[in-house]
Design a protein with these regions (language model features):
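Beta-propeller domain segments
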Residues: 2-4, 11-171, 179, 189, ...
Length: 222
């Protein structure tokens, strides 16, 4: 909404980098559309920090979406994997705000510490939210303003009903019906589109995978 380019980066399998200001790993970055650095970025001129950085302390961020009406930035993020020795699960949805620290690896999931941000939503066991999108169309009035997560490991779409920053309810959709869901988006026609990711070596693929699919309302009953 501010006409800037936002980029998310993982921690490059070295979790210490997420807290290091001189590394771009494990961060949200903010740039102008020509690649230059906005002068109002939070770490511009701060010793030991790269000026591109918007937020720090991320493990493996995935999708970004801005909430209609508030312009809050929502971010989906994958929690720790077994090889890191910190268990599984703890996937997150965060509200990402200027200059804040989202904790990895000091905190993750439901753990807390002073000065570090806890997630709006946490998922254990893991559902691997690969994308997120707000619905603002007119084909599904009941979905207006809802946040949708495409989940890989969970093989489903999660619908989150929100009131600003407050979570009202959640609903699992298409669970187990289409396999791993990679990307989800609202089309210009007002329908919801999503892509599957069953041929990435981690899913069971059908003969016609992978696919881009569309969700449409049920026709009215006669």
């Amino acid at each position: 909404p501010d006409a800037k380019l936002y980029v998310v980066t993982g921690d490059s399998t070295d979790w210490n980098l997420a807290q290091k200001g001189d590394s771009l790993a494990g961060k949200t970055l903010r740039l102008n559309d020509d690649g230059t650095i906005p002068k109002d970025n939070p770490f511009v001129g701060k010793e030991g920090y790269r000026p591109e950085i918007w937020t720090i302390g991320h493990r493996n961020p995935q999708g970004l979406a801005w909430q209609p009406g508030t312009a809050l930035m929502f971010q989906t993020e994958h929690g720790p994997s077994g090889f890191e020795g910190r268990g599984g699960g703890a996937d997150e949805v965060n509200i990402v705000e200027r200059g804040k620290n989202y904790g990895w690896p000091t905190i993750y999931g439901k753990t807390t510490a002073p000065g570090l941000e806890t997630p709006l939503l946490e998922y254990s066991p893991a559902c691997a939210p690969a994308s997120g999108a707000f619905y603002n169309g007119d084909k599904f009035p009941v979905f207006k303003g809802n946040f949708f997560l495409g989940c890989l490991r969970g093989a489903k779409i999660i619908r989150v009903v929100l009131d600003g920053r407050k979570v009202i309810s959640q609903e699992n959709m298409l669970e187990g019906n289409v396999g791993r869901v990679r990307e989800i988006a609202e089309g210009p026609d007002g329908f919801i589109y999503f892509s599957t990711s069953n041929r990435d070596g981690r899913g069971s693929s059908a003969a016609d995978d992978d696919r881009i699919m569309r969700i449409v309302p049920e026709p009215p009953k006669k």
